[in-house]
């Protein structure tokens, strides 16, 4: 045990849209960690809340004719209920727009002002003359001055990830009306982040959590630290002290929410919030997505230091999520919604929790695939863990009517102890994937133990020996149920009850895994886990594919209307592929020779990733024959092969057609 109270927080979900599985990469591991630490004897408080301020919420509320508060409350309830369904249970889930956070934020900002870490400065800020308003943050879009990518006003989210100050973005466009923005001067307030460079260089190397968080932050600090503008020209948000026309920047009041939510919890629990946020030895651990490392490892500890608060002891940053091998994108349809696509389809929260924690290392990119999901559920959860628990309890109930009154063999206890020690070390290192693997290794040991000892055969010759085997296996079952509970709480509570215990498994420590199960009657067991059927996986894949197709159709640029005469200018003919070979230095291009009946031509086509050369030879394809010749990768191309979609599906005739036939 650590000997000090632990406080675990999660990055705040933004109340601007529904929960998807990308969100869960932060919240499920945090809940897993909290449950495990509590079952290991640690005192842990788990707080979070919704992030309610900032320009995106104001814009969304304006677009739907609502108010930011109404929009925030709606999605706050949505996230609260979704987390409950996913068995992510916080001690406090607050709102950054609640009175406590307004009060705490203003208090901390006032202290920063008193300590000399905030100053006023007149800056150029984007202004839309058509809308007659200043354009903070996401009200404006333009070009990142650092890398040239398309960026929003406060962050280069599509490119280098750098924080952008007001006035830095180039070629600014108003997101409200689409008009060109101009720059006008306005007074704002800045936090002296640059004053904390030496502090951060000393603090970050000792910061616990994942190495990605430390290393990324150190890289940024070693380069250059700019002071942060901490005010915005908005009506919605926490008012900056002494200025009714300015609010505090959302990345100030959002992390301060961690403190506010701790205060709210402490008021109800009769505890002292200062035990967690004041003093040199705090036990604060932040679970965040990898895209907000800068805010949590640089800006946040500097702000806390400047205001005289304690500092986080660990930051655990996750990798990003991809969908079926594609970059996560709501606009392109590559998204899996937690409720609509998963929970509302009757799929267990336990299965998704397992997938998110066992798929890969927490800091690496996680790809969500429905096919892989089905395979892992069926092979690992059902086939390994569920199979061992069920066959053990079924045999115990059938042959002995309950748990034999026998102590487990020493070798079984030692194997359980080895497994639990491995799990404990990995959990405290935030190595969740390998911790889950170590748990599943114990289940595999159990399967091997019962299979090798074959009590169904042994009972015919030596009933006492068979009874000992089952007592050993039931001890392994107990250990598995206790250690898997933080990962799959619903299923393990049911398994605990089947073992004959009538209380809440959460009231028991993992250390009880080696205490004898004890003689007790067992009811006929039921299966803990159901397989995911192939037709269900196919239906879920179809839903995702349809969403992607709809998104692609909606995003497709609308082409201008052309006359029949203009279309007639295109000479589109059927051509037969005579040969196909890769172009040196390119992974995408083929050099094709095609037969047009009256002549043969050389054409370059970008279909190498989708077809082997021998698949193309002899195939009839559609060719634009009067396209101006061009050199592509140094190879002359006289025409264009027509193909459809991202997978480059070739357009071919349904019946045999002579090469050179014109398409009309």
From Swiss-Prot:
Cofactor details (free text): Binds 1 zinc ion per subunit.
Residues binding ATP: 330
Residues binding Zn(2+), per UniProt: 144, 147, 156, 160
Motif 'HIGH' region, residue numbers: 13-23
GO (cellular component) term, any one: aminoacyl-tRNA synthetase multienzyme complex
Cofactor(s) listed: Zn(2+)
Sequence motif: 'KMSKS' region, positions: 327-331
PROSITE patterns: TRBD
Name listed for the protein in its UniProt record: Methionine--tRNA ligase
Organism, scientific name: Methanoculleus marisnigri (strain ATCC 35101 / DSM 1498 / JR1)
Taxonomic placement: Archaea, Methanobacteriati, Methanobacteriota, Stenosarchaea group, Methanomicrobia
């Amino acid at each position: 045990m650590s000997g000090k109270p632990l406080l675990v927080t999660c990055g705040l979900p933004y109340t601007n849209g529904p929960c998807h599985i990308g969100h869960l990469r932060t919240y499920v591991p945090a809940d897993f960690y909290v449950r495990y630490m509590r079952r290991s004897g640690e005192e842990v408080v788990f707080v979070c809340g919704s992030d309610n301020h900032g320009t995106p919420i104001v814009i969304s509320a304006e677009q739907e004719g609502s108010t930011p508060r109404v929009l925030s409350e709606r999605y706050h309830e949505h996230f609260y209920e979704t987390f409950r369904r996913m068995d992510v249970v916080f001690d406090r889930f607050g709102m950054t727009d609640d009175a406590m956070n307004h009060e705490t934020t203003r208090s901390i900002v006032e202290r920063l002002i008193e300590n000399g870490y905030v100053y006023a400065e007149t800056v150029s800020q984007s202004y839309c003359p058509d809308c007659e308003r200043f354009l903070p943050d996401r009200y404006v879009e333009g070009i990142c001055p650092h890398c040239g990518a398309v960026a929003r006003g406060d962050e280069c989210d599509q490119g280098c990830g750098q924080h952008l100050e007001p006035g830095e973005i180039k070629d600014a466009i108003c997101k409200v009306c689409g008009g060109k923005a101009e720059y006008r001067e306005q007074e704002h307030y800045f936090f002296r982040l640059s004053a904390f460079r030496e502090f951060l260089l000393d603090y970050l190397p000792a910061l616990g959590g994942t190495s990605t968080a430390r290393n990324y932050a150190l890289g940024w600090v070693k380069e250059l630290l700019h002071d942060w503008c901490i005010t915005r020209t908005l009506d919605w948000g926490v008012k900056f002290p002494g200025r009714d026309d300015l609010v505090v920047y959302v990345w100030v009041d959002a992390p301060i929410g961690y403190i506010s939510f701790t205060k709210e919890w402490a008021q109800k629990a009769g505890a002292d919030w200062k035990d967690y946020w004041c003093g040199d030895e705090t036990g604060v651990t932040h679970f965040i997505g990898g895209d907000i490392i800068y805010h949590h490892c640089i800006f946040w500890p500097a702000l806390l230091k400047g205001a005289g608060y304690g500092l986080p002891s660990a930051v655990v940053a996750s990798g990003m999520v991809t969908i079926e091998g594609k970059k996560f994108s709501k606009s392109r349809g590559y998204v899996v919604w937690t409720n609509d696509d998963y929970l509302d389809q009757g799929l267990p929260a336990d299965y998704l929790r397992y997938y998110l924690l066992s798929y890969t290392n927490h800091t690496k990119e996680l790809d969500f695939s429905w096919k892989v999901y089905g395979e892992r559920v069926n092979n690992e959860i059902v086939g390994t863990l569920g199979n061992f628990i069920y066959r053990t309890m079924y045999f115990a109930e059938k042959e002995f009517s309950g748990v034999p009154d026998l102590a487990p063999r020493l070798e079984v206890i030692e194997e359980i102890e080895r497994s639990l020690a491995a799990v404990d070390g990995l959990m405290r290192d935030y190595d969740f994937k390998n911790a889950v693997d170590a748990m599943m290794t114990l289940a595999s040991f159990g399967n091997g133990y019962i299979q090798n000892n074959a009590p169904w055969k042994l009972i015919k010759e030596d009933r006492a020996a068979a009874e000992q085997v089952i007592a050993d296996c039931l001890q392994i079952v107990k250990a598995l149920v206790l250690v898997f509970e933080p990962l799959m709480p619903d299923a393990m509570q049911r398994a605990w009850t089947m073992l004959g215990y009538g209380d809440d498994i959460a009231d028991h420590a993992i250390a009880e895994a080696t205490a004898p199960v004890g003689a007790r009657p067992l009811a006929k067991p039921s299966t803990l886990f159901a397989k995911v059927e192939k037709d269900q996986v196919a239906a879920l894949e179809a839903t995702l594919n349809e969403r992607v197709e709809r998104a692609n159709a909606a995003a497709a640029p609308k082409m201008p209307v052309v006359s029949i005469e203009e279309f007639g200018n295109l000479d589109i003919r059927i051509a037969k592929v005579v040969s196909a070979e890769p172009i040196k230095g390119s992974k995408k291009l083929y050099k094709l020779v095609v037969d047009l009946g009256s002549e043969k031509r050389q054409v370059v086509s970008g279909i190498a990733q989708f077809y082997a050369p021998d698949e193309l030879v002899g195939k009839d394809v559609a060719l634009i024959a009067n396209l101006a010749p061009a050199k592509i990768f140094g190879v002359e191309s006289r025409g264009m092969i027509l193909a459809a979609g991202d997978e480059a599906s070739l357009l071919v005739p349904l019946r045999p057609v002579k090469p050179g036939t014109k398409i009309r």
